């Protein structure tokens, strides 16, 4: 649009007399002297078919990245180096999202997805990519994040920890939806949608859980008129599979009887979870507090079916072993395990050190961890409930001044408050740890916290990925920081 000099009405009147110096009154309907208007790009039409796209690289979440009209385009199902066409999903002010429609020039890393539901199910994002290429992509994501946001490069890159890419997952939560034709949908959310994908099986579930999907669907279908069940959770343990049925209305006697028969026929345990977070009950509605058994580094740990546990037992065992090797504790050392949960690292560590303290904000997990320690006869460890965003407790400060090593295993938000306080303690000479192992489930928060540790004088010695969730975009990693003398 050409810029035109404004007419007389667009000029400000010259102030005179008593009102001079004040902002003059300008009629609201008069033209104003403004900068030339920029033509705003029109938003792209949703579901529009886009032309050929060259996928430049991977994004942090495993999508392909391309350029479209000056915007960054995130393309689901695309691989770096490919030429594809795609359908637009969403157009945002600074970026757009699309999904592959046709692959014109395929990457040698592209494979046929092993799951029949992959095209619609949102549970997995990377089944079109070779497992080896998935690992490489995840490793690059972590290295790029810590370099870009933390300004750090590890001295050495650890070999990736991995398991079988299929049949590894020990826990899943399935949604239930009742269709207008009286059929039942049982499955996971669809990609980019809130609706469910009806699945016959799940290729990443452990076989003991996978075989329960069909019988559970039949049970739901036989009593569809009740429409009481909203979710079904599957959990695997050493003692066998377990099922948790969440319901919003009481189950009728016939439903409960059929569920009891299913449990006996399929050799699984079944509990109910009434609506309202009231805990678990048995099939008769009586409250129960069950436990299952999980093997961690050779130790049988008891856990509640709803406790947080790592979903990949094989990688979890290797992760614990690697953490202990990186910490390299001596038999006379004190080690602190922050965000210890039910003692996934703390309990296996007890046999290697003089003393280990697990710190956790969730009180039921502290209780569970201490009960496991007592049952296993481990008396050189202690579990404490603590607000890990505050280090003003004299006991915590004393422990920090005595510990020779620290392990951090925070949630996705990372440990900014805790690491900031550890940095400040180190600057005051009140933190003695020479080695810090950081277990991360979010490369971005790892990078941020790594920069804080660097400010405290800790160098990034080693970094590696752990493929806890093959075929998904989730990235787990482990880093070793050493204090620079």
Swiss-Prot record:
Residues 1-48 are annotated as: Disordered. The keyword Nucleotide-binding does not apply. It holds the Pfam family TRAM. Keywords: 4Fe-4S, Iron, Iron-sulfur, Metal-binding, Methyltransferase, rRNA processing, S-adenosyl-L-methionine, Transferase. GO terms for biological process: rRNA base methylation. Transmembrane segments: none annotated. One of its GO terms (molecular function) is rRNA (uridine-C5-)-methyltransferase activity. S-adenosyl-L-methionine binds at residues 310, 339, 344, 360, 387, 409. It catalyses: uridine(1939) in 23S rRNA + S-adenosyl-L-methionine = 5-methyluridine(1939) in 23S rRNA + S-adenosyl-L-homocysteine + H(+). Residues 20-40 have a biased composition (Basic and acidic residues). The active site is at 441 (nucleophile). Its EC number is 2.1.1.190. CDD domains: AdoMet_MTases. Residues 43-102 form the TRAM domain. [4Fe-4S] cluster binds at residues 115, 121, 124, 202. Belongs to the class I-like SAM-binding methyltransferase superfamily. RNA M5U methyltransferase family. RlmD subfamily. Catalyzes the formation of 5-methyl-uridine at position 1939 (m5U1939) in 23S rRNA. This is 23S rRNA (uracil(1939)-C(5))-methyltransferase RlmD. It comes from Cellvibrio japonicus (strain Ueda107). The gene is rlmD.
């Amino acid at each position: 649009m050409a810029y035109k000099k404004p007419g007389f009405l667009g000029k400000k009147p010259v102030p005179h007399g008593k009102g001079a110096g004040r902002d003059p009154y300008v009629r609201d309907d008069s033209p104003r002297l403004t900068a030339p208007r920029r033509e705003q790009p029109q938003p792209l039409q949703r579901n529009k078919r886009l032309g050929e796209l060259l996928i430049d690289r991977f994004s942090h979440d495993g999508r392909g990245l391309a350029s479209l009209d000056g915007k960054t385009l995130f393309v689901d199902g695309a691989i770096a180096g490919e030429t594809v066409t795609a359908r637009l999903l969403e157009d945002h002010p600074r970026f757009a999202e699309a999904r592959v429609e046709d692959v014109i020039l395929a990457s040698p890393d592209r494979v046929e997805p092993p799951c029949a539901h992959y095209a619609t199910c949102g549970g997995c994002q990377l089944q079109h990519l070779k497992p080896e290429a998935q690992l490489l992509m995840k490793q690059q994501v972590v290295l790029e994040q810590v370099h870009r946001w933390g300004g750090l490069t590890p001295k050495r890159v650890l070999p990736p920890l991995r398991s079988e890419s299929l049949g590894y997952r020990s826990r899943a939560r399935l949604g239930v939806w009742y269709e207008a034709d009286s059929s039942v949908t049982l499955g996971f959310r669809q990609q980019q949608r809130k609706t469910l994908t009806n699945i016959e099986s799940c290729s990443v579930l452990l076989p003991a859980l996978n075989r329960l999907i069909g019988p559970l669907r039949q049970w739901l279908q036989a009593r569809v008129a009740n429409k009481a069940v909203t979710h079904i959770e599957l959990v695997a343990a050493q003692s066998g599979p377990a099922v948790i049925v969440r319901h919003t209305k009481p189950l009728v006697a016939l439903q409960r009887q059929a569920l009891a028969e299913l449990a006996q026929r399929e050799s699984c345990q079944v509990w109910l979870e009434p609506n309202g977070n009231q805990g678990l009950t048995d099939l008769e509605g009586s409250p129960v507090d069950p436990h299952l058994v999980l093997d961690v580094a050779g130790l049988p740990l008891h856990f509640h079916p709803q406790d947080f546990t790592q979903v990949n037992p094989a990688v979890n065992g290797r992760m614990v072993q690697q953490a202990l090797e990186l910490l390299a504790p001596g038999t006379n050392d004190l080690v602190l395990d922050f965000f210890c949960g039910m003692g996934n690292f703390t309990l296996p560590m007890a046999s290697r050190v003089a003393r280990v303290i697990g710190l956790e904000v969730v009180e039921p997990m502290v209780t569970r961890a201490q009960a496991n320690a007592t049952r296993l006869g481990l008396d050189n460890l202690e579990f404490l409930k603590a607000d890990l965003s505050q280090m003003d407790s004299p006991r915590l400060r004393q422990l920090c001044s005595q510990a020779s090593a620290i392990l951090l295993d925070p949630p996705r938000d990372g440990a900014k408050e805790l690491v900031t306080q550890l940095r400040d303690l180190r600057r005051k000479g009140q933190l003695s740890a020479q080695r810090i192992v950081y277990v991360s489930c979010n490369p971005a928060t790892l990078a941020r916290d790594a920069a804080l540790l660097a400010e405290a004088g800790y160098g990034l010695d080693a970094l590696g990925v752990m493929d806890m969730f093959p075929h998904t975009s989730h990235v787990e990693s482990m880093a070793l920081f050493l204090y620079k003398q």
